[in-house]
């Protein structure tokens, strides 16, 4: 998949500026999208990129100067290092001596989290965060992680989707059941636009969310079909990756296996397939 080229700094609307995390890679695409939100002299920063990326800190400083603004507070969409990792550098290089909060949803089950000598201010589903020109509503959307947050930007009928939905490709997840529920929740928002955690802005928001839901259902059917066509045989998860993800580049097979394993666990819970140890874990159809 060839990726769109994204500038390191871009004003996306009158109240949203994207600052690219300068950390491109197979899992981060063009890099983590971080966003300055609002229209005033103090704005909200959503996500912070990875640790020790001086190019990102330089881009963020440039954005603050260009738009004559400062950071009111930080919101991180989830605990992954490519979203929280820049907090220490921002605290030291941009916010030194400033009093500001770093907001996120708590881990589930709860665990104490400390980053860069800061304690998080924990939010809850439905909380409202405001700054001049922007109103954000917290949406608890677990699945990618247990603490995942999306944010509704009321003024634009838009969603900051974190890693629940990407601008290109599909997302990985920890819990497929929760992830599907979160996609349904976002679909019900009837948003017009998505500002994703990675990749370009999505303008056909509802179509994209429906595409994600349909994609996961289709993957499930492919797994069941592969097992049913070989009834009596058992397969390792990587065997199934090579069948189901045959059009996916091999360097992404480990990530694909991660997703496929969650499909297998869901299908096992539903009694459609069974797991056997011989000596590695293998799967067969019950249908």
Swiss-Prot record:
Q: Which UniProt keywords apply?
A: Endonuclease, Hydrolase, Metal-binding, Mitochondrion, Nuclease, RNA-binding, Zinc
The protein's required cofactor(s) are namely:
Zn(2+)
Supply the SMART domains for this chain.
Lactamase_B (SM00849)
This enzyme's EC code(s): 3.1.27.-
- Superkingdom, natural source: Eukaryota
InterPro entries per the UniProt record, alphabetical: LACTB2-like_MBL-fold, LACTB2_WH, Metallo-B-lactamas, RibonucZ/Hydroxyglut_hydro, Sec-metab_biosynth-thioest, WH-like_DNA-bd_sf
Please tell me whether the keyword Endoplasmic reticulum is annotated for this protein: no
What EC class does the entry list?
hydrolase
Q: Where does the protein end up?
A: Mitochondrion matrix
Whether Iron counts among this entry's keywords is no
On cofactor binding, the record's note says:
Binds 2 Zn(2+) ions per subunit.
Query: One short Pfam family name for this protein?
Result: Lactamase_B
Extract the GO molecular function terms from the UniProt entry. Answer: RNA endonuclease activity; single-stranded RNA binding; zinc ion binding
Supply one GO CC term from the record: mitochondrial matrix
Q: Which residues bind Zn(2+) 1?
A: 78, 80, 144, 163
Q: Which residues bind Zn(2+) 2?
A: 82-83, 163, 198
Query: What family is it from?
Result: Belongs to the metallo-beta-lactamase superfamily. Glyoxalase II family.
What does the UniProt record say this protein does? Endoribonuclease; cleaves preferentially 3' to purine-pyrimidine dinucleotide motifs in single-stranded RNA. The cleavage product contains a free 3' -OH group. Has no activity with double-stranded RNA or DNA. Required for normal mitochondrial function and cell viability.
The name under which this protein is listed is: Endoribonuclease LACTB2
- Read off the lineage from the record: Eukaryota, Metazoa, Chordata, Craniata, Vertebrata
Instruction: Report which gene this protein is encoded by.
Output: lactb2
């Amino acid at each position: 998949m060839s990726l769109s080229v994204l500038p390191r700094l871009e004003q996306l609307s009158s109240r949203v500026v994207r600052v690219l995390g300068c950390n491109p890679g197979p899992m981060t695409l063009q890099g983590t999208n971080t966003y300055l939100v609002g229209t005033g002299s103090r704005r909200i920063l959503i996500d912070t990129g990875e640790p020790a990326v001086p190019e990102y800190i330089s881009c963020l400083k440039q954005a603050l100067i260009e738009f004559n603004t400062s950071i009111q507070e930080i919101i991180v969409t989830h605990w992954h290092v490519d979203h929280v990792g820049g907090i220490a550098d921002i605290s030291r290089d941009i916010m030194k001596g400033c009093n500001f909060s770093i907001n996120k949803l708590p881990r589930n089950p709860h665990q104490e989290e400390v980053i860069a000598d800061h304690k998080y201010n924990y939010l809850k589903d439905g909380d409202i965060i405001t700054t001049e020109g922007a109103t954000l509503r917290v949406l608890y959307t677990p699945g990618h992680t247990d603490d995942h947050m999306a944010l509704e930007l009321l003024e634009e009928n838009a969603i900051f989707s974190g890693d629940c939905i990407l601008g290109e490709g599909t997302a990985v997840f920890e819990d497929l059941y929760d992830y599907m529920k979160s996609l349904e929740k976002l679909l019900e928002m009837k948003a017009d636009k998505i500002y994703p955690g990675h990749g370009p802005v999505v303008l056909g928001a509802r179509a994209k969310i429906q595409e994600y839901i349909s994609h996961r259902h289709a993957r499930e059917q492919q797994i069941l079909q592969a097992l049913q066509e070989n009834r009596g045989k058992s397969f390792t998860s990587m065997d199934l990756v090579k069948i189901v993800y045959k059009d996916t580049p091999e360097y992404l097979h480990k990530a694909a296996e991660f997703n496929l394993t969650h499909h297998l666990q869901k299908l096992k819970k539903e009694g459609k397939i069974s797991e056997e140890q011989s000596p590695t874990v293998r799967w067969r159809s019950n249908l």
